[in-house]
Amino acid sequence: MAANKPGKEAILAAFFDEGSYSPLFTDGAVSAAFGCANGQSVYAVYQNGEPVGAADLDKTTRVLKMAAETGNPVVTFYNSTGAKLEGGLELLNANSRLTAEIARISGVVPQVAVVTGTCAGTSAVQAAAADVCIMAADAELFLTAPFNAEDKVKAAGSAEFAAKAGVAAIVEEDAVKAASAAARVVGMLPANNLAGPAVFDFEAPAAALNLVKYDAKSAAEAIADAGSLTELYAGYGRNIYTALGSVNGQAVGIVATAKGTLCHKCTAKAARFVRLCDAYSIPVVTVVNTEGFVKSEGDDQAGGIRQAARMAGVYAEATTVKVAILAGEAVGPIYTVFAASADWRIAVDGCTVAPLAPETAATVLYKDEIFASDNIQQATKQKAAAYKAEQCSAVVAVANGAADAAVKAADVRAAAAQALDMLATKRTTRLPKKHGNITL
C-alpha cells in the first residue's frame, strides 16, 4: 500500500460511528467487523489489498449469511491484487458460492460495495451486483485489465469510467470519503426489507419549486428536506436526477427529469434507482418535466426502446408508494411511463398533460383552418396555444382523471408530503407468478 493511501483503521473509523464497532475476523486477506454507521447496525467486510484465497471468500459469504439472518446491511470494502492462484478449483468454488450468496440476499438486506483499491474479474461482478457501488477516485474496477483489452478505451478501469458506465453510483476523492459516503447511504436505507423507512430530523428547503427556472436538481431540492439529498449515478444519464433524501423527515427516493430529452442511459438509470427503492419499500417521488425521449435511431439501436420499456415495467411493478409530480411537459409515453402507475399524481399549475404534443394535436384537429390561413406557422402556434390552454392544463388533467390534485408551484412540497403521509400504510399484493419478464 502506498504511503499516502489511507489504511484500514482510517477507513473503518470514517465508516463506523466512533467507538461502535468490534472485529469479527482478523486473520487473512479479509477481515470483518460489526458496529453502527450513521446510527444503523451494519456488518463490514474489508479486503486489505492482498490476494484472496478460498478461506477469505468463504469468510465473506459467512458474513453475508449472518447479515441476512440478523436483518442488517452489509458493506464490503474491495481492495485486492487478485486471487491466490494456488487455490485452484476450490478458489473457483468459493467465488461461486459468494456470487450466489450476493444474489440470494439481494433485496433482503442492503448491500453496499466500496471500492478503495483494485477490484478485478469476479470481484468486479460482485461489487457491481451490490445495491449501491461507491468508489474512491483512485480505485480500479474492471473485468479485463485495460492493458489486455483488444479495444483500448481512455480511462478504462478507472472510477471516472465506472461512473460514466453507470456502475459506480458515487465517486469520492479518496477511500476515507468513500467510506463516509457509504455510512451516509446505509443511514438512508432501512435495515432490511421488512423494516420501516428511516426517519430523520428535518428543516424545510430554502426555495420552492420554480417552473420558469426549472432544472432537475433544483426541483428535487425544492421537495426534499434541506441538505438531505445524496445523489446517485451523477455521472450517468445526466438528464435524469436520482437521489436518496427525506421529505418531512421520512426517507424517500427522488427521480427528477431535466427539461431536455431522455436517452437510453437516463431510462436505465431511473429503472435501476426505482428498483432499489422498491426492494426496500422506500417511497418514490417522481418530478416530470421533459421534452420526451430522444429522437435518435442511434439511441434506439443502443437500447432506447428496450430501456424505456424496462423503466415502464419497473415503475408499474413497484409496490412501494409512488407519487408523481407533473411539473411541466408530461406528454404521451412520458406520462404513461412516469405517472400512469403512481398512487397519487399532483399536477402543477402551468404543466402540460396530453396524449400528444399540443403542436402535433393542433395540426391534426385544426388542419383545414390552419391551411386556410394566410400564415400557416402563426396559425399553428395560435391553435396549439388554444389547445394547450383548453385541453392540457392541470385543472383539465384532474377533471379527466389524469391527475389527482392541482396545486400551485409554491405548494408542491406540502402536497407531496401530504400524499406520502396518506399513503404511508399502503398495502398491495401481486398476482401469483415466478417473476415478470420485463426487458433487462
Model region roles, listed by residue range:
Residues 1-440:
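Ligand-binding clefts of soluble mixed alpha/beta catalytic domains
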